[in-house]
């Protein structure tokens, strides 16, 4: 069997549709999806098998990254550093740009990325044919920069094979790097954590999802059931009250939604215990971010 394998960084502005694209390619719910920008905070490896037209069985390891953005908040700097690290580690990049975005995000990416890349135009199902053609024409001024320009829709599964074919074409022959049926090298407890975070984005509004995170205190994995004990961390006591809700209605909704998704992903029953704590300025403190597993490289210049 002829095989290829390689790491591909998936880069884009917040809400470009990176996580939706990966979940569609995997046919599974692993990456956090929200209509709110900047939902993804940590790099995740997602492994997509693909047989290309040359007969190679390719193992494409996508590095799902936080959206490219610049803010002074320490947490946001951590997120940006992960996207930059992914670009450095990958042999190929895919820049995902919404058909509704201007070209500024792509121009910023060009200044940051030194690797060969494919430009993918996402969400074409939400635009008219004329709008898609116009946006493709706008990007043609950078034709010498990208390997290929591919319009696609993850929601409608349009042109996804074309994207995978193009990626496989630019990977080198190699033995597979992971087991055949593995979709991610993430531990189940980390996937469960992201599912809880996604539920926060689903049921909470305004700034609360951005000023919250999840810590798995205890994870017990048994044959027929996973037991998850976690707490949601917020910045203020007032936010804690909102997360819990009157008579606990909000935390029950969040917990039920998360538990059902966990059971779908884990293919077994899940017991979920959620608590809420308030810790002032956790997203601005390096010690707190280290505890939560975010990578941060301080600029010492």
Curated annotation (Swiss-Prot):
Keyword line: Cell inner membrane, Cell membrane, Cytoplasm, GTP-binding, Membrane, Nucleotide-binding, Ribosome biogenesis, RNA-binding, rRNA-binding
UniProt topology in membrane: Peripheral membrane protein
Location within or outside the cell: Cytoplasm; Cell inner membrane
Domain of life: Bacteria
One term under GO cellular component: cytosol
Region called G3, residue ranges: 64-67
Region named G1: 12-19
Pfam families associated with the record: KH_2 (PF07650), MMR_HSR1 (PF01926)
Ranges where the record places region G4: 122-125
One Gene Ontology molecular-function label: GTPase activity
GO biological process, alphabetically ordered: ribosomal small subunit assembly
Residue span of region G5: 152-154
UniProt-listed InterPro entries: G_ERA_dom, GTP-bd, GTPase_Era-like, KH_dom-like_a/b, KH_dom_type_2, KH_sf_prok-type, P-loop_NTPase, Small_GTP-bd
Domain KH type-2: 204-280
Region entry G2, spans: 38-42
UniProt-listed CDD domains: Era (cd04163), KH-II_Era (cd22534)
Residue stretches making up the Era-type G domain: 4-173
Cited PANTHER family: GTPASE ERA, GTPASE ERA, MITOCHONDRIAL
Similarity annotation: Belongs to the TRAFAC class TrmE-Era-EngA-EngB-Septin-like GTPase superfamily. Era GTPase family.
Subunit description: Monomer.
Classification via NCBIfam families: era (TIGR00436), PRK00089.1 (NF000908), small_GTP (TIGR00231)
Job description of the protein: An essential GTPase that binds both GDP and GTP, with rapid nucleotide exchange. Plays a role in 16S rRNA processing and 30S ribosomal subunit biogenesis and possibly also in cell cycle regulation and energy metabolism.
Protein name per its UniProtKB record: GTPase Era
């Amino acid at each position: 069997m002829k095989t290829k394998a390689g790491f591909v960084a998936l880069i884009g502005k917040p809400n470009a549709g990176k996580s939706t694209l990966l979940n569609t390619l995997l046919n599974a719910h692993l990456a956090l999806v929200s209509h709110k920008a900047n939902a993804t905070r940590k790099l995740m490896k997602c492994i997509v098998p693909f047989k290309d037209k040359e007969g190679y069985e390719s193992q494409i390891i996508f590095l799902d990254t936080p959206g490219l953005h610049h803010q002074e908040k320490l947490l946001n700097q951590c997120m940006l550093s992960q996207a930059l690290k992914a670009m450095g580690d990958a042999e190929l990049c895919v820049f995902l740009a919404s058909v509704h975005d201007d070209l500024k995000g792509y121009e910023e990416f060009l200044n940051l990325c030194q690797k060969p890349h494919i430009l993918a135009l996402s969400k074409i199902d939400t635009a008219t044919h004329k709008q898609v053609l116009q946006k493709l024409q706008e990007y043609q001024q950078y034709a010498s920069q990208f390997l290929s320009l591919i319009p696609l829709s993850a929601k409608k599964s349009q042109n996804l094979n074309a994207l995978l074919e193009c990626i496989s074409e630019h990977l080198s022959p190699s033995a597979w790097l992971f087991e055949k049926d593995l979709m991610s090298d993430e531990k189940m407890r980390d996937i469960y954590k992201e599912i809880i975070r996604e539920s926060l984005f689903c049921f909470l509004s305004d700034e609360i999802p951005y000023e919250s995170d999840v810590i798995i205190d205890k994870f017990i994995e048994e044959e027929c059931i996973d037991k998850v004990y976690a707490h949601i961390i917020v910045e203020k006591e007032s936010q804690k009250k909102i997360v819990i809700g009157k008579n606990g209605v909000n935390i029950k909704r969040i917990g039920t939604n998360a538990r059902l998704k966990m059971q779908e992903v884990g293919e077994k029953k899940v017991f979920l215990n959620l608590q809420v704590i308030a810790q002032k300025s956790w997203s601005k403190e390096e010690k707190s971010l280290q505890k939560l597993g975010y990578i941060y490289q301080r600029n010492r210049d």
